[in-house]
Structures are given as C-alpha cells and as structure tokens.
Design a protein with these regions (language model features):
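Regulatory N- and C-terminal appendages and interdomain linkers associated
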Residues: 1-67, 76-88, 98-105, 147, ...
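Conserved ATP-binding subdomain of kinase catalytic cores across diverse folds
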Residues: 41-44, 49-52, 57-190
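Active-site acidic catalytic loop and adjacent metal/ATP-binding pocket
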Residues: 43-68, 169, 221-269
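A glycine-centered beta->alpha junction motif in the catalytic cores
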Residues: 74-75, 127, 131-151, 196-205, ...
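Surface-exposed helix-capping loop/turn segments at secondary-structure junctions
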Residues: 100-105, 171-181, 201-204, 227-231, ...
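Active-site catalytic-loop/activation-segment of kinase and kinase-like phosphoryl-transfer enzymes
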Residues: 126, 131-133, 172, 179-226, ...
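All-alpha amphipathic helical-bundle segments outside canonical DNA-binding/catalytic cores
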Residues: 157, 309-321
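Active-site activation/catalytic loop segments of kinase-like enzymes and analogous catalytic loops
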Residues: 261-264, 268-308, 322-340
Length: 369
C-alpha cells in the first residue's frame, strides 16, 4: 500500500484505522503498525534510501492481513518537491501489478496536513482549477508591430514593466546547491527542454541534421559544467515567461499564467524566454533584429540589468538561449516558419554557445549578419 507524503508523519492510530475502514470496509480493525527496513540503511555498502516503509497489520472480520505503507522523503535525487514524490508514487501504483512476481499495490493515497489519509486510486488524470483573469495576451502587442504598427509609448512602458517584474521576483534567493544543479540537469535532459526538443526534430530537416543537434547538446552540457558551481544564483522564477503567458489589462497592469518546471531556478531562464521573442518576430519581419523589436530587446535588457544589478546573467545566458532557440526554430512548435529564419536562429544559438559571455549589442552578429 503506497501513499503520498511530504514529510514522514507521526501516525495516529485513529487516523490509520479510519483509512483502513474507508478502504477495506467497516469490519477492518488495526492491530499494529511500525517501521521496517531499517537494516537497509545500516548495511556495509548501502546507506541511503528514499523512504520509510511502515508495516501495517489489520484484521477484516476473522482474516488477518499485512500491508506495507510506503512514503518518500524529500531528497536531492529529483525528489525535492512534493510533485516529484507524488509522480514517483503514482507511477508505483500504476506499474507494480504489471510486472510478473512484483508485489501488488493495494491503493495509492495522500495525507492531509492533519495526517488524515485518503485514497486517490480512482484518479486517471489530474487537473488544476485556477481563477479567471481578464486581459489580452502580450503577443497581440508584438504581433501588431510585426504587421507594421507603430511603436507606442505604452509598448516601452510594458517592456520596462515586464523586466522590472522579473528583477523583482529574482531578488528572492534560496541557498540550495543541489537544487540549482538539478535545474541545470533538467535544462539539458528534461523532456520539455533541450534533449526533449532535439529528439522532437524530424531529421534531416533542411540544414538541421543529427550532427547539428548533437553539437548543440554537447555545447550545452559543457555550459552545465561551467555553471554548476554558481549555486548562489538560485532564485524564484516563473519558468516559462513568454508573451503568451502574460495578460495585460489597462496600461502596465498585467497577470502571468502557467509557471513551469519549478519555483526556483536560474534567472537567465526567464530573461531569455521573453527577449528571444523580440528576436524571433523581428527575424520574421526584417530577417534581423531591427526597428521596434531591437529597441524593445535592448530596453528589456537595460531595464533588467538596472533593476537587478545582475551583470552575471549575461555570463550564464547561453544554454538558456539555446533552449529557447530550439523551441522557436522547431518545426513542431512553429511549422510555418521560413527556413531562412530557422537558419538564423540556429546560427544565433551556435554563436552564443561559442561566446564566453552574451552581449546584447551583438545579436545580429550572432545571427550571422
């Protein structure tokens, strides 16, 4: 029997017995419970484990039964967040019974803050319900510029507001070196990030070959080793800060949507996520960073650096630009993008990865222009 848990609870007999009766019927009676498996942490070699299993003995009528209630503790191996542990335990419940000779999972459940146990075994998919907020996507502002609209004072104000917002949330820091390194690992290997994207490319696709994608992966991994000791940079982040995830109302009043992949990370992820869209749309219109998009690109950087004081962000931005570049050049995500634009994005990515420090004034040079 497996359960979801943030920290190991102090079990109360009443709560555990109530759960057993809700799961196995009113005739269930708790007889005993206690920790097992301590010997695994005292062995000659293995001295680390992911959880603390509890043996539960109970009776249903005249039938005496035993079960194991398994939990997972927070830890550095991808188990830092409650959602990590939930994912692992839900997988346990779904998969145990499909392997011959494997012990069967009887249920999967969760604890409340008061240590009440409840089953979620009937769940097949999960959802989140959020509040509704009014607003227009920031992408609409940028699309107007692509279509020839003039740059307004409001456009400048909104760019400054977004950069100032990021500088503000990034001021909240956390000291957790393993978590910073985990976020760098995820940048490379997560299914939604660099390797997931490179695997999604149909190769060959024009000039994009397996060798081209492999070289980008290799360069990004070299950057991971270069950045892994910059753990002082771990900050509160949005995680997917692009124009479609920003809703503006009047003036500079806005809300953000759909933060992703973790509360804490590298600030460069948020900055590159937004500014690369100025580059993309400018490439679509002029085949270079130019006009209103060049102004907004530089304004965003200047404002962010002024408000954050984080000059180091330009020394760590390269692999995050690679991630976002692989998104916007993707034939899956952007199937109608002209091949010439994809080529310039790839040149941008390759040249930024090859530079020791990103320079906002050299964007067109990075694009091969």
């Amino acid at each position: 029997m497996v359960c979801l848990l943030k920290i190991m609870p102090i079990f109360k007999k009443q709560s555990l017995e109530h759960y057993l009766r809700s799961r196995f019927g009113p005739a269930a009676t708790l007889l005993s419970y206690g920790p097992i498996g301590k010997e695994s942490s005292k062995g000659t070699y293995k001295q680390y484990g992911y959880g603390s299993p509890i043996k539960v003995t109970f009776r249903i009528g005249t039938l005496r039964r035993h079960a194991v209630l398994e939990t997972m503790s927070p830890g550095p191996f991808g188990h830092e967040h409650m959602a990590d542990r939930a994912q692992a335990i839900l997988w346990d419940y779904e998969s145990y019974g499909r392997l011959p000779r494997h012990v069967k999972a009887l249920d999967v459940g969760a604890f409340t803050s008061t240590q009440t146990l409840f089953s979620v075994a009937k769940a097949r998919e999960f959802f989140v319900l959020t509040e509704w907020t009014e607003g227009a996507s920031y992408h609409e502002d940028l699309q107007r510029l692509v279509e020839g609209g003039s740059l307004r004072t409001l456009d400048r104000r909104r760019t400054r507001a977004l950069a100032t917002y990021l500088a503000g949330i990034h001021r909240r820091r956390r000291r957790d070196p393993p978590l910073y390194r985990r976020r760098l690992r995820e940048l490379i290997g997560h299914g939604e990030c660099i390797m997931g994207l490179t695997d999604s490319y149909p190769v060959p696709f024009g000039f994009i070959t397996q060798d081209v994608l492999a070289a980008i992966e290799d360069a990004c991994n070299q950057w991971r080793w270069r950045l892994r000791n910059k753990t002082h940079r771990l900050s509160q982040v949005h995680g997917d800060f692009h124009p479609w995830n920003v809703l503006f109302r009047r003036g500079t009043d806005f809300s953000v949507l759909d933060r992703s992949r973790g509360e804490w990370g590298e600030p460069a992820d948020d900055v590159t996520s937004m500014v690369i869209n100025y580059l993309l749309l400018s490439l679509c219109r002029w085949r270079r960073l130019h006009g209103p998009f060049e102004l907004l690109f530089r304004l965003f950087w200047d404002t962010y650096l002024e408000q954050s004081g984080d000059e180091e962000v330009m020394a760590v931005a390269a692999p995050f630009f690679a991630f976002r570049g692989l998104v916007i050049a993707s034939p899956v995500w952007y199937p109608k993008l002209p091949m010439e634009v994809r080529r310039r994005i790839f040149r941008f990515v390759e040249n930024v990865l090859g530079a020791s420090r990103f320079d906002p004034a050299r964007v067109n040079e990075y694009c091969g222009l």
